[in-house]
């Protein structure tokens, strides 16, 4: 971490005198720059092109050095559009990698890949910046203890628990509740863990980024009246950006999260939406730099690029970064190199189901498809593991019986199967719960359910103690006591 001069500071003018180059070639977002002999910039150095285009418009383009070509030439990738640049324009070597603002002042704000605020709320009130390129923490700094990251969301904590400092893949199509789940996690980490979040929008739709910002303001995750009380910082590099920006925006978000972990010593949630677009941007840059493509046209450095990002997301003795990454699977092909490389790094998967969303069961997390490496008796304990397995078995049996029920009806089932179906339907409904961030839409107050309460509730359903209660009593409640109270209210209404 360091205090860096911004490019508008007088301190930069001395750099300008020292190391100036000139543009020799422009191919789309790729620039070749010639420097004086012996003054070649390092790989990953930031270069700044300032000047005016042919119609007198001000130009300020930042690039990142990717290759040293020989003959005093470097090849750099632009982080913004190169419209208006011409050969012969002056290029300033800043002498350092891209650096972005970090710390509490970033909360509630939206940044681009360069760490510049893009929300029209004025400059960021911090002089502390951090370079986006750094190595992963050393082994000696890592916290290797396996511990569960409690989210307060029943279906996640019971069936596919998150690891503190782990990486989770979030799979789901449009309109099944990905955004609401992300916002609830941001809200819960702030309330239960005193932590904050960083959201990296990598190569997704600008409209979705805008919608997310508006929803965060509406639900209180971003506090408009007192911006410092916000729980999240947003970093956007959307679909319309050049590939250089999309390739680096994930690192910008990660750098902000690392500062909160290492300096503020807090737990951080890092959301990356979408990790596939990070790979896709790397593939575009690789082709522009003239590298030979690898399998399915991807960059030959795919595993290295993915590893350099993912290995920085970890728990240290100071704090943890727990990352939730939306994963787009091209043509639903899980063997595609991009998702296949991502899977190697994931500790858990949360799969959202359109079928459950259609039934009105929110969060629409599929209890049978979602997985976690943490669901082992030696990590979560015998009681948790046994309860989770019995819940999955009951739901699996219900799934198998659905065809018979659809054709012949419930009456044709055996007594045992009818009991299984009744309990499975109660479990399915009890896996739903009201969210804090959805209060403004639903009118029902949100619920945070601790892990011990969650396990107790499902044990009571499985034991048959609650067989007499109507299944609608289990729908959209917090803990099991609320379900029994709701059942009594329903009984009272009938009378």
UniProtKB/Swiss-Prot annotation:
Gene3D superfamilies: 2.40.10.170, Bovine Mitochondrial F1-atpase, Atp Synthase Beta Chain, Chain D, domain 3 (1.10.1140.10), P-loop containing nucleotide triphosphate hydrolases (3.40.50.300). SMART domains: AAA. It is a peripheral membrane protein. It is found in: Plastid, Chloroplast thylakoid membrane. Its EC number is 7.1.2.2. It catalyses: ATP + H2O + 4 H(+)(in) = ADP + phosphate + 5 H(+)(out). It holds the Pfam family ATP-synt_ab. Keywords: ATP synthesis, ATP-binding, CF(1), Chloroplast, Hydrogen ion transport, Ion transport, Membrane, Nucleotide-binding, Plastid, Thylakoid, Translocase, Transport. GO terms for biological process: proton motive force-driven mitochondrial ATP synthesis. Belongs to the ATPase alpha/beta chains family. F-type ATPases have 2 components, CF(1) - the catalytic core - and CF(0) - the membrane proton channel. CF(1) has five subunits: alpha(3), beta(3), gamma(1), delta(1), epsilon(1). CF(0) has four main subunits: a(1), b(1), b'(1) and c(9-12). This is ATP synthase subunit beta, chloroplastic. The gene is atpB.
């Amino acid at each position: 971490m360091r205090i860096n001069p911004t490019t508008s500071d007088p301190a930069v003018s001395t750099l300008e005198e020292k190391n100036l180059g000139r543009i020799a070639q422009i191919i789309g977002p790729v620039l070749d720059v010639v420097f004086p002999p012996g003054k070649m910039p390092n790989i990953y150095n930031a270069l700044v092109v300032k000047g005016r285009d042919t119609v007198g418009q001000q130009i300020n383009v930042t690039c990142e050095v990717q290759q040293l070509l020989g003959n005093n030439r470097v090849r750099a990738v632009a982080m913004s559009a190169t419209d208006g640049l011409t050969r012969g324009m002056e290029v300033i070597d800043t002498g350092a990698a891209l650096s972005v603002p970090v710390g509490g002042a970033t909360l509630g704000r939206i940044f681009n890949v360069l760490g510049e605020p893009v929300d029209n709320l004025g400059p960021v009130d911090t002089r502390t910046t951090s370079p986006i390129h750094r190595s992963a923490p050393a082994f000696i700094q890592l916290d290797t203890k396996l511990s569960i990251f409690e989210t307060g969301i029943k279906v996640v904590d019971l069936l596919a628990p998150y690891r503190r400092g782990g990486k989770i893949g979030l799979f789901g199509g449009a309109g099944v509740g990905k955004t609401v789940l992300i916002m609830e996690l941001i809200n819960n980490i702030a309330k239960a863990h005193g932590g904050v979040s960083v959201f990296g929008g990598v190569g997704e739709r600008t409209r979705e980024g805008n919608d997310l910002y508006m929803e965060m303001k509406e639900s209180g995750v971003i506090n408009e009246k007192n911006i410092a009380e916000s729980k999240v910082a947003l970093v956007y590099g959307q679909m319309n950006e050049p590939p250089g920006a999309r390739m680096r925006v994930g690192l910008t978000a990660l750098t902000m999260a690392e500062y909160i972990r290492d300096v503020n010593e807090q737990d951080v949630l890092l959301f990356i939406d979408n990790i596939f677009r990070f790979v896709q941007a790397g593939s575009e840059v690789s082709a522009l730099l003239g590298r030979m493509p690898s399998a399915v046209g991807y960059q030959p450095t795919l595993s290295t690029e993915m590893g350099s990002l993912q290995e920085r997301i970890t728990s240290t003795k100071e704090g943890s970064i727990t990352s939730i990454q939306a994963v787009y699977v091209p043509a639903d092909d899980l063997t595609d190199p991009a998702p296949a490389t991502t899977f190697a790094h994931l500790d858990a998967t949360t799969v959202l189901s359109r079928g459950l969303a259609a039934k009105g069961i929110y969060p629409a997390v599929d209890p049978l498809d979602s997985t976690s490496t943490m669901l082992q008796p030696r990590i979560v304990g015998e009681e948790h593991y046994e309860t989770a397995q019995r819940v999955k078995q009951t739901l699996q049996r219900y799934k198998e019986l659905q065809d018979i029920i659809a054709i012949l009806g419930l009456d044709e089932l055996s007594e045992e199967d009818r009991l299984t179906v009744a309990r499975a339907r109660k479990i399915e409904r009890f896996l739903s719960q009201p969210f804090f961030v959805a209060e403004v839409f639903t009118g029902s107050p949100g619920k945070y359910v601790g892990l011990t309460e969650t396990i107790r509730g499902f044990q009571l359903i499985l034991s048959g103690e609650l067989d007499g209660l109507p299944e609608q009593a289990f729908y959209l409640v917090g803990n099991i006591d609320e379900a029994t109270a709701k059942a009594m209210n329903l009984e009272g209404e009938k009378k």
